[in-house]
Amino acid sequence: MDKDNAECFTQVASSGDAALLGLGAAAAVAAMQRGEFTAERYATALLEQADRWRDLNAFRTLDRDAVLQAARAADERRRRGGALGRLHGLPVPVKDSVNTRALPTSNGTLSLSGFRPSADAGVIGLLGEEGAIVMGKTNLHELSFGWTSNNETFGAVRNPYDLARSPGGSSGGSAAAVSARMAPLAVAEDTWGSIRLPASFCGIAGFRPSRGRYPDDGIMPLSRHFDQVGPLARFVEDLVLFDRIAARDARAIEPRPVTGMRVAVPAALWAELDPEVERVARHALARLREAGVSVVEIAGSLNEVARAAGIVGTIVAAELRGSVADFLRRHDAGVAFDDLYATLGSNTKNLMDAMVLPPHTPTREAYEAALRERNALAASVAAGMREHRADVLAFPVAMVRAPRIGEETGVTIDGGRTIDAFDALGRNVGLGSCVGMASIVLPAGRADDGMPVGIEFAGLPGGDRDVLAIGLSLERLLGGVEPPAVRA
């Protein structure tokens, strides 16, 4: 248990249920397993917090009665001496693009608002086997196709640090729920930044695993090359807990010693940043250096990493329509792609028209060229990291702080400069998606306006355990950020 978890736990008995909200998932589960408090008491505290923060619009569906009933069942199991799972009694919000049998899965779009999957997604089944309770389905950018979670059908998700700003997307509801202490751990999904951007903008941690590390069945797709389910949490130990369950890997992951750790900083992903983002992120790197981490600035090799976003964009645009149509057929959603398209909100439809549909659909030649470029870039990144003996690459998750709600095509920063959204939000997260890297996001600090800034630490594909071990160490050095303002 880390220091913040320990402090929260010691306050529980004396300060009522408010202190429960500060516990991480692993700490809360351990306390419930010991009988320090009941699952029903814990679930009630989280549901009351969700009510306090209702104006964030984090949840699409929230069945309070079902959550409390499941919590009581968990308590009864413990009283009877039954086996308790690693997520015993833990309510977990689930992004509404991930199939759940008990609740509708809308993917944030009107035509699927009544879709009831016949089975849970694979990852939900694994969490349930360990005692997790589906707390509800979280709001998101429509079809998971966007970076703001400004959903025109079900309403915009709002950032707990500033209600006028976006929490990022597309997993904005999951991130807002974790940031606002409605739950310590949530299920999200990342095609092109949809875990990492919300983690950064909401001041929490997130993990995009290597492609294929977790089961991907029952998750509404955009691209077969890039879609990846993953966790959002306030503490890295909870990302580790999720990983061990979802990857079916029981081995412990311990913090990586700082001695000998090498972090490479690719200049191309630090160019033209919002000055406040750069200031906060540079200060975080300085703290790592002071603690003994070897931080290596790379000005020459690896400069081509900024090409990744364009490659990802071409592949996603080529695969999206077929991927969505195939999912709708296989899961008997009762809706065809054309029907779904007809009911899209304007910001999603405009993006679809500009990227995916004729005459803008990438040609077969362009698609195949992008796949070749992807493979070449992956080889180049691996070679560059070996050359510099880098354990991870480090760069700001986004060029900007959280956009204001309504900034869909461009983000205006201090001084009046507007950065195209493709660059502002998509450039840096493109690398991890394109190369299939194991990537963890940690809070670096807060800008002068109080908004969080996150750094992505990206390791080579297959290096998930190493990246999580590094994350456990770096989290302690960076220290996290203050949570959003308390609501009584």
Question: What role is predicted for each listed range?
Answer:
Residues 1-80, 245-426, 434, 473-488:
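Amidase signature
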Residues 5-192, 286, 291, 385-387:
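Gly/Ser-rich catalytic/binding loops embedded in alpha/beta enzyme cores
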Residues 92, 455-461:
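A short, well-structured catalytic beta-strand-centered motif of the EAL phosphodiesterase domain
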Residues 103-104, 144-146, 197, 274-275, ...:
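Short glycine-/acidic-enriched loop or helix-start segments at secondary-structure transitions
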Residues 108, 170, 220-228, 265-269, ...:
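Flexible glycine/proline-enriched surface loops and loop-helix/loop-strand junctions
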Residues 119-246, 434-446, 451-454:
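Short glycine/serine-rich loop segments
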Residues 152-155, 202-206, 313-317, 411-413, ...:
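Short, hinge-like loop/turn segments at secondary-structure boundaries
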Residues 463-473:
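A short, polar/charged loop-to-alpha-helix boundary motif
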